[in-house]
Amino acid sequence: MDLDNNKYYQQALQYIADTDLSELENGKHLLDGDNLFVNIVDSDMKTPEQARLEVHDKYIDIQVPLSKDESFGVKPRKDCVEPDGEFNTEKDILFYKDKDWTTVTVEVGQAITFDPDTAHAPLIGEGTIHKAIFKVKVA
């Protein structure tokens, strides 16, 4: 996927660079309507056994941990073999039961991007995390 030519992705990166995300209130913040928005959330973290891989068709995720480091399970979508239900077009999400992923840890101050070709299992860790989840329309 050519992210360099996705104007919404470039807008998101600029917003991340220019904004203190920790100052944003929890909730959905529209940056360019449904083309680009960010959800600021507090979420309970999960064990690797509890975490589920997810994929999206319409949106690229940029996930930014704000309060603590966060680990993610990551696997190419084409290699996922065990869907957990049907694709939910309204929520733009499909889960997988696969557990044979690579674990990546993202530190506070870093961001990670997941395009529609990459399955990801977020929120791996202990306690509660404050984070930003950018939803970037696939151009």
List PLM regions with ranges:
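Conserved metal-binding segment of the jelly-roll/cupin
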Residues: 104-119
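Short alpha-helix capping/helix-loop boundary micro-motifs
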Residues: 58, 96-101
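Conserved short histidine dyad/triad with adjacent acidic residue
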Residues: 38-56, 66-80
